[in-house]
């Protein structure tokens, strides 16, 4: 017969092990596991140039926390579509040039995009893209007149956070460990629960 105190300690230890393993898998602050290869989640910090609508206003830099991720479908299989999502849930289509680390916002019909803090993301054209100096992160700006009025053109520079994505093999190992620990916990719990009955039958 297994001592009741010992069985309780073993069950508690196994449950703690399972919780710890699941925490490693699911906690974004420790290790992030990509659940599929078609969509890659990234956290970015976007630096946006802002200005008032009059031409004499000073330009200033502001940081806006956002999420940016890449969508792949049939049309964008080899050219992933970048989507910027703000804290308020608004989404902006963009293009991402990984060589210089800049997000380019596609602007077909919209001129201004509102952020939660009231900041407006400045839009980009080809001439501005060619004026980027990536080493010092100095960006130039231009102004473009559209049918909707003045629209400021500028660059949103993104800095990607360093986050480690586990390989398929590592994910498989973590899942196997978790399933094994969970199975051990269930079996031990059943054994300890049925142990008094076995002793009675014996």
UniProtKB/Swiss-Prot annotation:
Glycan-linked positions: 54, 107, 112, 125
Record's GO cellular component terms: membrane
Membrane topology value: Single-pass membrane protein
Transmembrane among keywords: yes
Signal peptide: 1-20
Ranges that cross the membrane: 172-192
Keywords of the record: Glycoprotein, Membrane, Signal, Transmembrane, Transmembrane helix
Location (main, coarse): membrane
Cellular compartments annotated: Membrane
Protein name: Glycoprotein U22
